[in-house]
């Protein structure tokens, strides 16, 4: 993903006058996911699922939820950064075919959920809140950041019979280093490695 030049220049400008301001601005930028239009391939899942907005008091935000009802085990699907709950439509369809009650949601600041900003700790709180309100879930599948958030929910007592993570980074630092390098707060990839 290429960062627009005006953002790079604004970070450099702030950094010239105040490193602290530049870092705060970079942290704010990092919290804003890119929103993409839902592609046609996700429409079947969107149309066949039950949609409900649920308020998550722990983060003071509303999230859009999607459910394919069934009488079998409950499975939670958690998408990655800049994605949508409907993005996991193929997994949802297969799980539902096997008789599972499938549940997914748009992370805060994603899809049809409220807000323009979010960070991993907020998403973990959403996963935990859904586990308590709608769960417990028998299974959980997370893609990228979604996998990180499911793994973190385990630390706080959520329990799943099985959990699957797909392309989840094992170290969050790499994502931050890459972003900081792209906005030119670090000027070489070697410098980014030295900061780890």
What is each residue range found by the language model?
Residues 147-157:
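Short glycine-enriched nucleophile-adjacent loop
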Residues 92-112:
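Conserved alpha/beta-hydrolase
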Residues 2-54:
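An N-terminal hydrophobic leader/cap segment in hydrolases
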Residues 117-134:
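Alpha/beta-hydrolase active-site loop
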Residues 187-192:
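Conserved small/polar residues in nucleotide/adenosyl-binding loops
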Residues 81-92:
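The serine-hydrolase catalytic nucleophile loop
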Residues 141-142, 146:
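Gly/Ala-rich beta-loop-alpha elbow adjacent to hydrolase catalytic centers
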Residues 165-173:
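Active-site nucleophile loop of the alpha/beta-hydrolase fold
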């Amino acid at each position: 993903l290429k960062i627009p030049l005006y953002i790079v220049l604004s970070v450099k400008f702030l950094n010239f006058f105040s490193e602290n301001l530049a870092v705060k601005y970079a942290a704010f930028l990092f919290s804003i996911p890119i929103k993409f239009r839902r592609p046609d391939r996700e429409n079947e899942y969107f149309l066949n699922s039950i949609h409900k907005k649920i308020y998550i008091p722990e983060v003071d935000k509303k999230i859009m939820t999607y459910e394919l009802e069934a009488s079998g085990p409950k499975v939670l699907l958690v998408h990655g950064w800049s994605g949508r709950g409907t993005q996991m439509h193929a997994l949802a369809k297969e799980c539902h075919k096997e008789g599972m009650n499938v549940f997914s949601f748009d992370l805060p600041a994603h899809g049809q959920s409220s807000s323009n900003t979010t960070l991993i700790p907020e998403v973990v709180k959403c996963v935990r809140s859904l586990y308590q309100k709608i769960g417990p879930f028998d299974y959980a599948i997370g893609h990228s950041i979604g996998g990180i958030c499911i793994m973190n929910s385990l630390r706080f007592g959520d329990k799943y019979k099985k959990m699957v993570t797909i392309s989840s980074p094992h170290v969050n630092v790499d994502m931050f280093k890459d972003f900081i390098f792209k906005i030119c707060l670090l000027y070489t990839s070697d410098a980014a490695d030295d900061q780890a």
